[in-house]
């Protein structure tokens, strides 16, 4: 299980994170709930749930979202210890948030003898209840303290979010392949990794193209070459990050026998 399923899913998560999907999830959560009472804490909960779909790691989830949400919560008026607790609790839910869950979910599928897709489907309701409980807690705390949200004019625009929604295509592909049973788990992860590489290439190209003043054949070609180089570097970085992440899981699997 460790070498056929878990490692590939960890590598896929590393590739997907480098496409910029974490920033997209944070911006989406910011737009969705940032305006409400105690908005930054709700942003932390929603963004941690969304990023947990990709990482399956509590620590990685905290590092990704916490660097943005914790300072924002403190600035809004939450106590530092409460802000840290909210982020830690929300990020821990990444272990049980499908489709990419913690290593324990893969081991459950192996030992019980049921497909991983069934484990992921059964985890949807508990995961939603978990994050709903945290969301209600931060809402009640915000009402008790009388905290406001983020002004609407400072929130990301829906139009810009819609432009970047292509970043979630590899995740959608993975969910479809796993749920439909069209491919094996290993093949599903491999195809999703290739999709993440393609999406990352497009994202790098778009970023470089946006930084150019004029759109000529030369500038577009230069942006394409630069994006290819950025994508190649991202592939090596993703493989390195995936390998490092797999070491911890491999040790846990070895201890479990």
Residue ranges and their predicted role:
Residues 121-241:
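Long, contiguous bundles of hydrophobic transmembrane helices that form the permeation core
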Residues 1-23, 212, 217-257:
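Core transmembrane alpha-helical segments of multi-pass membrane transporters/permeases
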Residues 109-125:
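Helix-coil boundary and interhelical linker segments in multi-pass alpha-helical membrane proteins
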Residues 27-94, 100, 104-105:
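Hydrophobic transmembrane alpha-helices that form the pore/transport pathway of multi-pass ion
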Residues 49-50, 92, 103, 107-111, ...:
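Alpha-helical transmembrane segments of multipass membrane proteins
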Residues 26, 30-34, 51, 155-162, ...:
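Alpha-helical membrane-interface segments at transmembrane helix boundaries
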Residues 1-4, 31-44, 76-82, 162-168, ...:
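Membrane-interfacial loop-to-helix junctions in multi-pass transporters
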Residues 5-9, 39-40, 48, 94-103, ...:
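Hydrophobic alpha-helical transmembrane segments in multi-pass membrane proteins
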